[in-house]
């Protein structure tokens, strides 16, 4: 994960009461929106004003699981409860940019919908089980997310490259 990449200062909030100014004023190189429980629509509504302030600053951003769903909602995508959630390891996901298959760990009961997917986002990953959206990136800012847990990577570390991509995005944005 991020900690194993030797990053310096990390600002951590474990609730939804963060203030965008706390992150912006400290000039952090990136913003990581992690996983968590709950309905993404309800969580997004609680953090929408602060999250939008961050997104407007175009700070490099990486989201996983619930973070993926929330970022998708911030760009006007839709989410829905799944009939059967994705739980456990060994979920094959196709990276549409490389055409490689990654074996992922997943634990979610909501999904980002293909229907009316925003044109300012690009789908980057799809589940090979049910073709649901498992990754996206923004076309006009340094932001990407995945539905699964790259920090778990039950395969031979199939998805850990995403943390390197996030670091590269932060370095590129800083320079």
Roles of regions detected by a PLM:
Residues 13-22, 39-40:
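Short acidic loop-to-helix transition motifs that present clustered carboxylates
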Residues 1-11:
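Single conserved hydrophobic/aromatic residue that forms the stacking wall/gate
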Residues 24-114, 155-169:
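Cysteine-nucleophile active-site neighborhood
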Residues 99-142:
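Catalytic beta-strand/loop cores that center a nucleophilic Ser/Cys/Thr
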Residues 9, 13, 117-120:
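Acyltransferase
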Residues 14, 82, 124-126, 136, ...:
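Hydrophobic residues at beta-strand termini and immediately following loops
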Residues 135-175:
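A glycine-centered loop/beta-turn motif at secondary-structure junctions
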Residues 5, 21-26:
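Pre-Walker A segment
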């Amino acid at each position: 994960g991020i900690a194993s990449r030797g990053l310096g200062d990390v600002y951590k909030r474990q609730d939804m009461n963060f203030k965008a100014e706390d992150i912006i004023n400290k000039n952090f190189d990136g913003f990581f929106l992690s996983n968590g429980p709950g309905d993404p629509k309800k969580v997004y509504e609680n953090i929408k004003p602060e999250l939008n302030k961050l997104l407007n600053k175009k700070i490099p951003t990486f989201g996983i699981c619930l973070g993926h769903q929330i970022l998708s909602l911030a760009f006007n995508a839709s989410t829905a409860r799944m009939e059967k959630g994705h739980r456990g390891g060994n979920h094959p996901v196709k990276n549409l940019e490389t055409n490689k298959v990654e074996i992922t760990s997943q634990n979610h009961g909501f999904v980002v919908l293909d229907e009316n997917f925003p044109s300012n986002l690009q789908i980057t990953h799809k589940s090979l089980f049910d073709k649901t959206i498992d990754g996206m990136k923004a076309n006009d800012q340094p932001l990407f997310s995945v539905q699964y847990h790259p920090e778990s990577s039950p395969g031979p570390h199939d998805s850990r490259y995403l943390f390197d991509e996030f670091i590269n995005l932060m370095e590129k944005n800083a320079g």
